[in-house]
């Protein structure tokens, strides 16, 4: 079996960094899919649907271009949301929303859902899976919240925090996959590759 290249259908620097950390250097092709068109209230279904839509947008673009060198590739799409008290949160729209969100999050336990969609163009197969990690937030004070939001890091992240950045200071612990919280569960990605007949070491 010819080993394809991996296309990351995301502009997330964190997801790109995770893949490079394990020896995979993907082609980055950010999806322009409009996430606001998907209205689902169940978080697992929401992130799986969005991840698949992002990957399919890139797949359709590749097939329309009829570029043979790309038509045997694997396309990875991901999407993450945080759930606190049955409320689904993505990226905050502005600093005030981020501050208000953190005032609700502090001292709480949230569920971080990341949907993963992997399309194998050569085999015409798609695998869609989700992983959930529990995140225990610290009892941070208003001054810490305002200072953190001023860095603008929370504005770039689903869930309003980056566990691999400054936000890691305010996370007591997690239950589950660490990289899932960053935006891509590496162990789950390995399983998805296996299900398509590949070994992760094929991509090193």
UniProtKB/Swiss-Prot annotation:
| InterPro entries listed in its UniProt record | ITPase-like_fam, Maf-like
What this protein catalyses is: a ribonucleoside 5'-triphosphate + H2O = a ribonucleoside 5'-phosphate + diphosphate + H(+); a 2'-deoxyribonucleoside 5'-triphosphate + H2O = a 2'-deoxyribonucleoside 5'-phosphate + diphosphate + H(+)
Q: Cofactor(s) for this protein? A: a divalent metal cation
Tell me which residues this entry annotates as catalytic.
79 (proton acceptor)
Enzyme Commission number(s) from the entry: 3.6.1.9
Which GO BP terms, alphabetically? nucleotide metabolic process
Keywords attached to this Swiss-Prot or TrEMBL record, sorted alphabetically, are:
Cytoplasm, Hydrolase, Nucleotide metabolism
Which residue pairs form cystines in this protein?
none
One MF term from GO for this chain? Answer: nucleoside triphosphate diphosphatase activity
A GO cellular component entry from the record: cytoplasm
Matching entries from NCBIfam families are given as: maf
Q: What does this protein do?
A: Nucleoside triphosphate pyrophosphatase. May have a dual role in cell division arrest and in preventing the incorporation of modified nucleotides into cellular nucleic acids.
Family to which this protein belongs: Belongs to the Maf family.
Could you tell me what this protein is called?
Nucleoside triphosphate pyrophosphatase
Please report the organism this UniProt entry assigns to the protein. Trichodesmium erythraeum (strain IMS101)
């Amino acid at each position: 079996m010819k080993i394809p290249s991996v296309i990351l259908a995301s502009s997330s620097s964190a997801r790109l960094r995770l893949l490079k950390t394990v020896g995979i250097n993907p082609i980055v092709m950010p999806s322009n899919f409009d996430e606001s068109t998907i209205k689902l209230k169940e978080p697992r279904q929401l992130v799986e649907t969005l991840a698949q839509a992002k990957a399919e947008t890139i797949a359709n673009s590749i097939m329309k271009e009829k570029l043979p060198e790309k038509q045997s590739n694997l396309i990875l799409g991901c999407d993450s949301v945080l759930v606190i008290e049955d409320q689904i949160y993505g990226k905050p729209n502005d600093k005030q929303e981020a501050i208000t969100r953190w005032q609700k999050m502090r001292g709480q336990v949230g569920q971080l859902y990341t949907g993963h969609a992997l399309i194998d163009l050569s085999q015409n197969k798609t695998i869609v899976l989700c992983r959930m990690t529990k995140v225990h937030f610290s009892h941070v004070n208003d001054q810490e919240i305002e200072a953190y939001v001023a860095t603008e890091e929370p504005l770039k992240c689903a869930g309003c925090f980056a566990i691999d950045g400054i936000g890691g200071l305010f996370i007591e612990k997690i239950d589950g996959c660490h990289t899932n919280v960053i935006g891509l569960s590496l162990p789950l990605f390995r399983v998805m590759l296996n299900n398509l007949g590949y070994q992760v070491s094929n991509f090193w």
